[in-house]
Amino acid sequence: HLIPHMEFSAQVLNCLPVEGDKWQPRIDDLSNRSDFRQECVVSVDPPGCTDIDDALHCKDLGNNQLEVGVHIADVTHFIRPGSAIDREAAERGTTVYLADRRIDMVPGLLSSNLCSLISGRERLSFSCVWKINSKTGEIYQTKFSKSVIQSRASLTYAEAQTRIDDPEDQGEIAQSLRRLNSLAKILRAKRIEKGALVLASANEIRFVEVESETAENELVI
């Protein structure tokens, strides 16, 4: 199906940090970056997810104000424009997930490690931080910046829901998740009130082989 699936070339691999999985951000890497390493940042993903590309934090500022941060892995720190790895990623276009394997867009050292917001690891990111009214969802302030984070926890959806539902869990992570959950409900209600189109997505897509009019076999959903 013309999906690029060959091993990464030596030229591409030479673009990776020489420290490998022992890479740590240097002081120079952190200049001009907002520091969110002390915030209660967590990620929520499907079970088995290794390429954690986004994480969240939600802090109570008092007076019905929340600070909400969305942090996205800063892949551009490792992939320079026009480099061999940049050209290879452009050629591949996306990571392809098959039933029995995945075909990475970039080498696993980046996708599953250095550009994955793994809990307990310092990671470079892009952040959008809002100050929001916790009762109305009104946004008071928005700030974008390059940043550095250190996630507190890499949770599955079920693990996050368990923390939200457990009344005995009054830890920082659980309270942050509850604030995010409450705010999400407010924002969703506002979107629906304004006429948002809500589409249900199927949990599973099945492909069926059929015979076309040209007698060639085709795959259809």
Tell where the protein language model's regions lie, with residue ranges:
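Electropositive polyanion-binding surfaces
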Residues: 10-221
